[in-house]
Swiss-Prot record:
CDD domains: Kunitz_HAI2_1-like, Kunitz_HAI2_2-like. The lineage of its organism: Eukaryota, Metazoa, Chordata, Craniata, Vertebrata. This inhibitor contains two inhibitory domains. Changing residue 163 to C: In DIAR3; pathogenic; has a significantly reduced ability to inhibit trypsin compared to wild-type; reduced peptidase inhibitor activity toward prostasin; decreased inhibition of prostasin is due to abnormal SPINT2 glycosylation. The record marks 48-49, 143-144 as: Reactive bond. This is Kunitz-type protease inhibitor 2. The chain crosses the membrane at residues 198-218.
């Protein structure tokens, strides 16, 4: 009887241990699933297709549109906004507790696309007029087609261009108003473009050269006059003065 009770207790203990292990595995799988499908950042991939997809931005708590290249993506990649919200709408940054470390490790192992550099991605950057307003418009190597605006420092106005979706620069704005607000009259004397700088430097060099040549000519003329005066004084000696005085006496 005692052996039977002991056997039952052992079975109950093993069943409890098994259920705990199973629940732990399921919880780990769920956390891993949440991480892979909702917490990682979007990945455009190395291919150059142009597929509209949705990804869950856990910081904003919303699903956002992006352009997928067609390969080397991750699980945070949905065909529709509804599918994205269904999977991740209730997920927050603190949903998985201490998964921040594992999330960073996973992000580093996923091949990521070149970081999009445009005017919307400068939350921690200091404003630099040359970087945000004088740089040329850059379409980039990707093949998406985003209408953007850039500031033309020579015309002091914002013009539209097509942004490919990757490897742009900071002089890229989603609206003309944002472009003008960022760059128009931000600097009373904005730095000149490289071509204008070369022209200005060349003009200054020519002016300095002309002034130097003019000063040299004036100096040489003065030296020549002084030498001529000294030569005349040497020829007209005191003996010549006496001879001239005697001639004048005889004439009188």
């Amino acid at each position: 009887m005692a052996q039977l009770c002991g056997l039952r207790r052992s079975r109950a203990f093993l069943a409890l241990l098994g259920s705990l292990l199973l629940s732990g595995v399921l919880a780990a799988d769920r956390e891993r699933s949440i991480h892979d499908f909702c917490l990682v950042s979007k990945v455009v991939g190395r291919c150059r297709a142009s597929m509209p997809r949705w990804w869950y931005n856990v910081t904003d708590g919303s699903c956002q549109l992006f352009v997928y290249g067609g390969c080397d993506g991750n699980s945070n990649n949905y065909l529709t906004k509804e599918e994205c919200l269904k999977k991740c709408a209730t997920v927050t940054e603190n949903a998985t507790g201490d998964l921040a470390t594992s999330r960073n490790a996973a992000d580093s192992s996923v091949p990521s696309a070149p970081r999009r550099q445009d005017s919307e991605d400068h939350s921690s950057d200091m404003f630099n007029y040359e970087e945000y307003c004088t740089a040329n418009a850059v379409t980039g190597p990707c093949r998406a087609s985003f209408p953007r605006w850039y500031f033309d420092v020579e015309r002091n106005s914002c013009n539209n261009f097509i942004y490919g979706g990757c490897r742009g620069n900071k002089n890229s704005y989603r609206s003309e108003e944002a472009c003008m607000l960022r760059c128009f009259r931000q600097q009373e004397n904005p730095p000149l473009p490289l071509g204008s700088k070369v022209v200005v430097l060349a003009g200054l060099f020519v002016m300095v050269l002309i002034l130097f040549l003019g000063a040299s000519m004036v100096y040489l003329i003065r030296v020549a006059r002084r030498n001529q005066e000294r030569a005349l004084r040497t020829v007209w000696s005191s003996g010549d003065d006496k001879e001239q005085l005697v001639k004048n006496t005889y004439v009188l």
